[in-house]
């Protein structure tokens, strides 16, 4: 029998933290209102996010939106909103995701001040974040205190198994999605039953406009899929973890302080290379898509040279680290160029092109498709990358840092590296594998 009350006591904010959050939030809203009056700005401060909805976990942050009248031009709204943010957070920094905002701290509490437009139910959003105001109102109307604790349990569970967070770092479940799941299914265990008993795409709302792995329509915006950020891997991980928990319930599924197991590195008979690049100072939502482009470019290069990639991992620390594992340590001496089918209009062009080029065989047919073989200089994975990465775009910011790429060979590494820990880790589901036995 799981003692859910003990779990909640462990991760729910205590009275001291709640009082601190209340004091800071009251200061922010009062001060923001004063600034708006003093500068004749037609806007109101509105607390949003998990604290405003009462679904926050301990050590949380505060989100203050500055909601402007809808007749402001968007650029003016952003400029004035950022100005208010800097007044409230003198040491804050401007950040950009879908929308510019100011991020800073007061007394150890992280605070985001975000400009937006006022929005009522049924109105169209003007800026990307306007609907957040309605999310807060909707959740507070639909959830009572006990249900909000069910949201907290779901959040802790998802954090523990590595699927919480809609940001590009995780491609998982947002806090708002957790709240909607509890609103829809009543409690934490019912939500887990949903994940454990469904197969294929999880279409909670069957809307043919969306082809995402999971679909749940936003009740305040019928044109938005709240679950659009959930990747197939995150959905699959949640399904496995839900089955494991329901089969063998354990409080270990709610342990956010669990220390990661240091896996044993071992020779798999494969070629493992770690490519690192300087890390630009960017928000996760801007940085991580570029990291994934970097990894994809490395994998495509390995495929292009028939190196047979079989594994990969990423980690972000002082630099960005991408591990690529291939079956081969060196490329083939023969490279096969795949041409068009014989019955296509460009088949003759392919033949003519290669008849004037150096080759070891061909053009020749296999079935109805043309091929040409060329003799290639044999290269190691790192030689392939360093001589060819320039032809791939890996993102606006990382493209400028390609000259900082460094390579480490697995067989030469002494000590521990976190990206290797991730690669060799047995913690596929937050270290819970043993609980399924």
From Swiss-Prot:
ATP binds at residues 50, 53, 135, 155, 164. The keyword Nucleotidyltransferase applies. Its EC number is 2.7.7.72. Homodimer. NCBIfam families: cca_archaeal. Catalyzes the addition and repair of the essential 3'-terminal CCA sequence in tRNAs without using a nucleic acid template. Adds these three nucleotides in the order of C, C, and A to the tRNA nucleotide-73, using CTP and ATP as substrates and producing inorganic pyrophosphate. tRNA 3'-terminal CCA addition is required both for tRNA processing and repair. Also involved in tRNA surveillance by mediating tandem CCA addition to generate a CCACCA at the 3' terminus of unstable tRNAs. While stable tRNAs receive only 3'-terminal CCA, unstable tRNAs are marked with CCACCA and rapidly degraded. This is CCA-adding enzyme. The gene is cca.
